[in-house]
UniProtKB/Swiss-Prot annotation:
The gene coding this protein: ilvC
Listed GO MF terms: ketol-acid reductoisomerase activity; magnesium ion binding
GO CC terms of this entry: cytosol
Protein name from the UniProt record: Ketol-acid reductoisomerase (NADP(+))
Species, as recorded: Tolumonas auensis (strain DSM 9187 / NBRC 110442 / TA 4)
Family recorded in the similarity comment: Belongs to the ketol-acid reductoisomerase family.
Length: 494
């Protein structure tokens, strides 16, 4: 199979990379009616599979789960999750032939074998759904021409898809129709109905393309969403220990600091996050972020270039063929890191203390978010897509670190994201360790700035505030956050 993106000519590549339209709410007036009375069969019952299925059923759709025969016979986790929630569960042969929409929500690595198994069983004119387009775009899987291929990609982990739905809301979602597989012209109607059934239409839906979703999703998760958080956690902890900060305190400051800092990001963008700092601390964080932006831009561009060209996917699939040797080795190395094994800290850390004593962490977030956004948009990805794949998802990933540190993050994210995370972090750690960490001390990580007063130069402060607030991600973010003002706020600090 050939990489689908690489089979397109330049004009087609740019057209698909740039496909992005924020859909009006009135386009979802009929909600999920288009799929009512039809049979939806989900393949796979992990976090996305279970939670999307629960939402779709609660929206009035007929949902069942097709699992491998051995998963049913051995009563594996997927079988238990589906059956204990009252769903009909059967083998591929039992359920696929009567399905109107087959939704493939298995891990990326399994997509080729799953599609190969289900496609011969699908009836003429059925639809095949994905929540990530890697199999279509990077692996180049070709689907039978009578089958409609659509995507609905919630921009958060599966657990949040369910929690926001239960609150009467939803999560921002990308939808797409594969241009090679829309024989009846009803792909968009199917995708809209599926998105509405999960609640996504209440939080904002982007009509995108398989190509744009894959290329932006891979970039976001490798760099700011996972890779930067992993690199920052390892480096900040090592620095604090070297400078005499209590190990338990250092571990807690990082573990819960990312979540607390990015909650401000979620509510008001980079502007709100930076405004939580004192004026001297804001200027210091800005300086550090600018230095990191210059230092790390080539690394961000390399990752985007490798994603666009397909080099990243080729390397990862080679590791799949090698029984995930690199993935497992990097996972083991992460588990052995000092931060992952930091002792517990029973003391309380006030919310503001995470900002005051985590100036370097704030700077890392600012630099990483802006670099990811800029690198995506200069590659032809539209600003709205770049926002969702950088700033928007960051608090959701930070929340996983708050639960069980980097282990939890790497368990929750996809296998593709985990591999890309290690690839980026393994390059970012030595780069930052050589050029940034020797220049900083406990004044920006572990303690706080030692200043006699909070006085700063007014002209400099005004200039810095203008730069922060006028960054393109702040402009598009203000509009998109307007659709998400009802999203749950998390408890921070403690």
């Amino acid at each position: 199979m050939a990489n689908y993106f690489n089979t397109l000519n330049l004009r087609q590549q740019l057209e698909q990379l740039g496909k992005c339209r924020f859909m009006n709410r009135d386009e979802f007036a009929s909600e999920c009616d288009f799929l009512k009375g039809k049979k939806v069969v989900i393949v796979g019952c992990g976090a996305q599979g279970l939670n999307q299925g629960l939402n779709m059923r609660d929206s009035g759709l007929d949902v069942s789960y097709a699992l491998r025969a051995e998963a049913i016979a051995e009563k594996r986790k997927s079988f238990k999750q589906a059956s204990e929630n009252g769903f009909t569960v059967g083998t591929y042969e039992d359920l696929i032939p009567t399905a109107d929409l087959v939704v493939n929500l298995t891990p990326d690595k399994q997509h080729t074998s799953v599609v190969k198994a289900v496609m011969p069983l699908m009836k003429d004119g059925a639809a095949l759904g994905y929540s990530h387009g890697f199999n279509i775009v990077e692996e180049g899987t070709q689907i039978r021409k009578d089958i409609t291929v659509v995507m609905v990609a919630p921009k958060c982990p599966g657990t949040e898809v369910r929690e926001e739905y239960k609150r009467g809301f939803g999560v921002p979602t990308l939808i797409a129709v594969h241009p090679e597989n829309d024989p009846k012209g009803d792909g968009l109607a199917i995708a809209k109905a599926w998105a509405a059934a999960t609640g996504g239409h209440r939080a904002g839906v982007l009509q995108s393309s398989f190509v744009a979703e894959v290329k932006s999703d891979l970039m976001g998760e490798q760099t700011i969403l996972c890779g930067m958080l992993q690199a920052g956690s390892i480096l900040c902890y090592e620095k604090m220990i070297a400078d005499g900060i209590d190990a338990g305190y250092a571990g807690k400051l990082i573990q819960f600091g990312w979540e607390t800092i990015t909650e401000a990001l979620k509510q008001g963008g980079i502007t709100a996050m930076m405004d939580r700092l004192s004026n001297p601390a804001k200027l210091r964080a800005f300086e550090l972020a600018e230095e990191m932006r210059v230092l790390m831009r080539p690394l961000f561009r390399k990752h985007q270039d490798d994603i666009i060209s397909g080099a990243f996917s080729s390397g990862m699939m080679a590791d799949w063929a090698n029984n995930d040797a690199d993935l497992f080795r990097w996972r083991e190395e992460t588990g052995a890191s000092a931060f992952e094994n930091a002792p517990a800290f029973d003391g309380a850390i006030a919310e503001q203390e995470y900002f005051d004593n985590g100036i370097l962490m704030v700077a890392m977030v600012k630099a990483g978010v802006e670099l990811a956004f800029e690198t995506m948009t200069e590659s032809g990805i539209i600003a709205e897509s770049a926002y969702y794949e950088s700033l928007h998802e960051l608090p959701l990933i930070a929340n996983t670190i708050a639960r069980k540190r980097l282990y939890e993050m790497n368990v929750v994210i996809s296998d593709t994201a985990e591999y890309g995370n290690y690839l980026f972090a393994n390059a970012a750690v030595p780069l930052l360790k050589a050029h940034i960490m020797p220049k900083v001390g406990t004044d920006v990580i572990g303690k706080t700035l030692s200043v006699k007063d909070n006085g700063v130069d007014n002209v400099t402060l005004v200039q810095v505030n203008e730069i922060i607030r006028n960054h393109p991600i702040e402009q598009v973010g203000k509009v998109l956050r307007g659709y998400m003002k009802d999203m749950k706020r998390i408890a921070v600090g403690g």
